[in-house]
Design a protein with these regions (language model features):
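Hydrophobic, helix-length membrane anchors
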Residues: 1-45, 128-138
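Alpha-helix initiation and N-capping motif
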Residues: 22-25, 71, 88, 117
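Generic structural signal for well-ordered, non-membrane alpha-helices
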Residues: 23-30, 52, 56, 76, ...
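Non-catalytic alpha-helical coupling and interface elements of nucleotide-dependent molecular machines
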Residues: 34, 55, 59, 125-129
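Generic detection of long, well-ordered alpha-helical segments
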Residues: 40, 44-48, 110-117
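Short, charged amphipathic alpha-helical segments flanked by flexible coils
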Residues: 42-97
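Cytosol-/stroma-facing membrane-proximal "stalk/adaptor" domains immediately downstream
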Residues: 80-138
Length: 138
């Protein structure tokens, strides 16, 4: 006798693995680099995206509510995490630069803007490698 039940809906294709905070941040930084924001002179938007992405990465990686903190408050909180002091200082300096452009009208040279994006990506790489090294040492 044929079965009258509908096929089970629980047999779904597996969902792709979630992207790591490191990969997600680096992907956003690549998108910013590929955007035409600098060519269009949209420095405020360029720096807004850098700052937002870096804060989001820090929040996900280190469990710190980075979006709700000033750079100096963030530096104090990061000192209590596994992030190195050097990386924390670099993150704070980059976020301060972002705020200077967004809110104080600072207009950096194109080379400086490109370097700031590279600095944000380097912070992600440094903290990613440092965290991986801690796991393998233990």
């Amino acid at each position: 006798m044929p079965t009258l039940r509908a096929p089970s809906a629980s047999k779904k294709a597996p969902s792709p693995p979630e992207q790591s905070p490191d990969d997600a941040a680096l992907e956003v930084f690549d998108q910013i680099a590929d955007s035409l924001l600098l060519d269009k002179g949209e420095l405020s938007e360029y720096y807004r995206r850098i700052g937002e992405s870096l804060r989001g990465y820090i929040a996900h990686r280190f469990g710190v509510p980075a979006s709700a903190m000033t750079p100096r408050e963030l530096e104090e909180r990061l000192e209590a995490t596994s992030m190195s002091k050097l990386a924390a200082r670099q993150a704070v300096a980059t976020l301060e630069q972002c705020q200077s452009v967004q809110f104080a009208g600072y207009v950096p040279a194109r080379e400086r803007a490109e370097a700031d994006l590279m600095a944000a990506a380097e912070i992600v790489r440094l903290t990613s490698e440092a965290e991986g090294a801690e796991v393998t040492e233990g």
